């Protein structure tokens, strides 16, 4: 099975953005060392516009993911900037009951049975996985399907804001830390694998 990985930026107190979902306070920590990490380890998680701005180029191959799933709130950020396919270098899926028709041929809308679609994507053959881009609502809906967490923890205390998983009621899930890396600017990237009971 392919993995569903929630690769997400988070504050040290566990929020992925302020109460409105704005995560711009994290951007000041994206320095040369961190950009090199993204470029070599997770280049596909940088949008097409971000790749152009940062000089990645379109020829940088995907390393971990070939599919991205995001909720309407996350996707709307790109639409507001006139970008209907922010991750054109991957298969793009947007979970939305309100969007209707896709504004781009590379973007498939998932109107219902989100769990069924994700399980079908995970069952596909392939070496590259599925990136759960966010936001909090879709992460909450897919919490039980997440196989791996990659937390980019920024040295910022937000106090309140958007949680990593919205709408999840006291579901205890165990994960194992599989790797961690500390950057000079205080950012810590930790990777966790879900511990599932053997069937």
Residues of each region from the PLM?
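Enzymes that bind and transform nitrogen-containing heteroaromatic metabolites
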Residues: 1-199
């Amino acid at each position: 099975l392919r993995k569903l990985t929630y690769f997400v930026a988070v504050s040290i107190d566990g929020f992925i953005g302020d109460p409105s979902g704005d995560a711009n306070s994290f951007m000041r920590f994206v320095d040369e060392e961190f950009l090199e990490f993204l470029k070599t380890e997770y280049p596909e998680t940088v949008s097409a516009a971000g790749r152009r701005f940062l000089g990645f180029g379109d020829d940088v191959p995907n390393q971990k993911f070939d599919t991205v799933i995001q909720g309407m709130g996350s996707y709307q950020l790109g639409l507001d900037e006139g970008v209907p396919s922010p991750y054109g270098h991957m298969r793009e899926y947007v979970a939305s009951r309100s969007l209707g028709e896709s504004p781009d041929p590379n973007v498939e809308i998932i109107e219902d049975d989100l769990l069924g679609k994700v399980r079908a994507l995970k069952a596909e053959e392939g070496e590259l996985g599925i990136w759960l881009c966010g936001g909090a609502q879709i992460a909450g809906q897919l919490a039980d399907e997440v196989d791996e967490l990659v937390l980019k923890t920024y040295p910022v205390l937000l106090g309140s804001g958007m949680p990593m998983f919205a709408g999840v009621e006291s579901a205890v899930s165990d994960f194992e830390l599989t790797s961690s890396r500390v950057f000079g600017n205080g950012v810590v990237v930790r990777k966790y694998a879900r511990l599932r009971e053997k069937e």
